[in-house]
Curated annotation (Swiss-Prot):
Record-linked InterPro entries: SASP_SspH (IPR012610)
HAMAP family: SspH (MF_00667)
A Pfam family it matches: SspH
UniProt cross-references to NCBIfam families, sorted A to Z: PRK01625.1, SASP_H
Similarity remark: Belongs to the SspH family.
Name of the protein in question: Small, acid-soluble spore protein H 1
Gene induction: Expressed only in the forespore compartment of sporulating cells.
Primary residence: other
GO cellular component terms given for this protein: endospore-forming forespore
BP terms from Gene Ontology: asexual sporulation; sporulation resulting in formation of a cellular spore
Keywords: Sporulation
């Protein structure tokens, strides 16, 4: 995935399934300059991690 698509997903009112290393995640924010996103595991929303947007996959 790229930064442009991450920003589209963030601004969308639709539910778009995204995974990180095969785990379903919600995207919380995107850092365009760093090319990273803050995501959290759908099953464990209390923990978020920063990941490279290229590691995210749209399902």
């Amino acid at each position: 995935m790229d930064v442009k698509r991450v920003k589209q997903i963030l601004s969308s009112s639709s539910r778009i399934d995204v995974t990180y290393e095969g785990v379903p995640v919600w995207i919380e924010s995107c850092d365009e300059q760093k090319g990273s996103a803050q995501v959290y595991d759908v099953s464990n929303p209390g923990e978020s991690v920063h990941v490279d947007v290229t590691a995210l996959e749209e399902k």
